[in-house]
Structure formats: C-alpha cells, structure tokens
Amino acid sequence: MSSRILTSHFSGLEEFLQQHAALLAKSTDGTVAVFANNAPAFYALTPARLAQLLELEARLARPGSDIALAPQFFEEPAAAPVAVPMGKFAMYADWQPDADFQRLAALWGIALSQPVTPEELAAFVAYWQAEGKVFHHVQWQQKLARSVQISRASNGGQPKRDVNSVSEPDSHIPRGFRG
C-alpha cells in the first residue's frame, strides 16, 4: 500500500532513530511522518493504526453492494471511422485531417512542431465552409498545413497574446539611450 498519510505529528530522521517508541506513543493517531532533508522519507505506524488502514483498504476494495451491471453496459461500440468523401468535396463541419497529419505535412515541406489545435482546425473549417470551394482530401490537408504554418509564423512563432491582459512597461533602458 503506497500512499500519503495526513498527520500532524512529525519528526526528523535522527530524532526518530533515537526515540522512535516515545514518538509513536506520543502521537494521537498512531502515525508519525519522518522527514529527511525537509521531505517526507517515510511514515511510522503503530500496529493498531496499520490494522485500521489495512481494514479500510480491504473494505474499500469490496463492492458496496451485491448488485452488478451486465458487461454490455460497459462496452462502448467501436467508433466507426468517418469515411473521407471520394473525389472533390466542399468543406464540412466534421472534417478532420488524417491521424498522421504532422508526418504528411513534413513530407510536403511544412514542419509543424505541434499538432493542429482544435481552435486552428475550427477556424480553418469555418473559413473554407463559407468559401464553398471544392478540393480533394489531400488538398484540404495541404491547405490546412499551409494555413497553420502561416498563422503560427505571423506571430513570430510566439503564442497569441491575451488581448485582455494589462501590459506592463519594462524599466530596461537600451544601450545608447539616456535614462
């Protein structure tokens, strides 16, 4: 049983080595946290407290009632893969790039350090739905890769700033300027 125990009684390792019996007897709940280098090293328990914890663990491991649900209620049906339309198609709301999209983008010469975020995908889909243009699935993925690359590069690779944050001027004076 590996866990952390909340106790208000603690001791340093050296003190515990010298008077372990007295420290355990003095604790009200039968537990002492022993610290080494300002971090908990281990917990010392009285036999009575250990028996309480083991009984509690055994009780929690048993089911709370004798009613059991049939396994069919726990089995979720396998998600049917969304079929990619053949040929050219207009962008639709549930469109998703392939699972290996980052690898494909790299093959097309577009290195994406992070996967496409749901926000980036939603913006792309919304834009192209309104346009109403038709392309093949691979062409849509190439457009998405270029779109993400351009949007990320437009901010110098930095994450977008929070427009609601209050800016704070720095007090650094560049070389060559008087302060």
From Swiss-Prot:
Family: Belongs to the DnaT family.
Encoding gene, per UniProt annotation: dnaT
Compositionally biased spans, kind Basic and acidic residues: 159-173
Purpose of the protein: Involved in the restart of stalled replication forks, which reloads the replicative helicase on sites other than the origin of replication. Can function in multiple replication restart pathways. Displaces ssDNA from a PriB-ssDNA complex. Probably forms a spiral filament on ssDNA.
InterPro entries named in the record: DnaT (IPR020917), DnaT_DNA_bind (IPR040480)
GO cellular component, one term: primosome complex
Keywords: DNA replication, DNA-binding, Primosome
Listed name of the protein: Replication restart protein DnaT
Assembly and binders: Homooligomerizes. Interacts with PriB. Component of the replication restart primosome. Primosome assembly occurs via a 'hand-off' mechanism. PriA binds to replication forks, subsequently PriB then DnaT bind; DnaT then displaces ssDNA to generate the helicase loading substrate.
Region (Disordered): 151-179
Native species: Klebsiella pneumoniae (strain 342)
GO biological process terms, semicolon-separated: DNA replication, synthesis of primer
Gene3D superfamilies: 1.10.8.1180
